[in-house]
């Protein structure tokens, strides 16, 4: 497991600045948040087609990794299932292009029934996981929302039993929301924890 920070909420920084911050703070990587921002969209962006190779070279020169892409969608939102699938498939495509091993999924804190959440998430993962498996990318469900109770996340992960579907341990959510100790998280998730 590598120590990395997310670019979430840092909209006024360049990717070079993120790399400098990570290197200065002795982090091992950076997590990319929001594939719709300028870094991916604009022709001057660090990950636009022609700039991506140079950006990756700078990352490797600083001995950093891009740990994961953080999907914006809420996989539990069944009303947005089609848009969520498109976003996750795009995340997988970008991950392949940029040699990023993981795509993070995060269930929101919306007021939905547990069965609705499991149904929506299972349906979405079953549509995206085959592409991720084919491309060697892992989908990681964060320990947030309903899944801050890591026994529920284990139940979901067990239902797929795929090497390309694992857990992303959000320390604060599992501790403060789920009220779980690190020992309990590892007891429930074990080898499913990838990041």
What feature does the model see in each segment?
Residues 1-101, 126, 162, 191-193:
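N-terminal pre-domain/capping segments
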Residues 6-10, 33-37, 71-74, 108-110, ...:
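Active-site beta-loop-alpha junctions enriched in small/polar residues
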Residues 18-20, 45-47, 82-85, 117-120, ...:
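Short, glycine/charged-enriched secondary-structure capping and boundary segments
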Residues 38-43, 75-79, 109-115, 175-179:
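A short acidic, helix-capping loop that chelates divalent metal ions and anchors anionic groups
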Residues 52-53, 122, 150:
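Short, surface-exposed alpha-helical segments at coil->helix boundaries
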Residues 102, 126-195:
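Acidic/histidine-rich catalytic cores of soluble enzymes
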Residues 111-125:
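Active-site cleft segment of glycoside hydrolase catalytic domains centered on the general acid/base Glu
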């Amino acid at each position: 497991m590598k120590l990395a920070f997310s670019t979430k909420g840092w909209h006024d920084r360049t990717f070079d600045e993120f790399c400098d911050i990570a290197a200065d703070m002795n982090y091992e990587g950076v997590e990319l948040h929001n594939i719709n921002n300028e870094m991916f969209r604009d022709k001057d962006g660090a990950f636009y087609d022609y700039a991506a190779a140079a950006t990756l070279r700078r990352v490797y020169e600083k001995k950093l990794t891009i740990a994961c892409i953080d999907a914006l969608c809420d996989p539990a939102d069944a009303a947005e299932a089609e848009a969520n699938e498109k976003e996750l498939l795009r995340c997988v495509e970008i991950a392949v292009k940029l040699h990023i091993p993981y795509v993070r999924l995060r269930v929101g804190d919306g007021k939905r029934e547990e069965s609705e959440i499991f149904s929506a998430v299972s349906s979405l993962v079953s549509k995206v996981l085959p592409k991720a498996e084919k491309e060697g990318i892992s989908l990681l469900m964060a320990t947030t929302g309903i899944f801050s109770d890591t026994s529920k996340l284990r139940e979901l992960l067990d239902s797929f039993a795929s090497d390309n579907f694992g857990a992303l341990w959000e320390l604060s959510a599992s501790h403060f929301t789920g009220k779980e100790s690190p020992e309990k998280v590892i007891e429930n998730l074990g080898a499913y924890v990838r990041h």
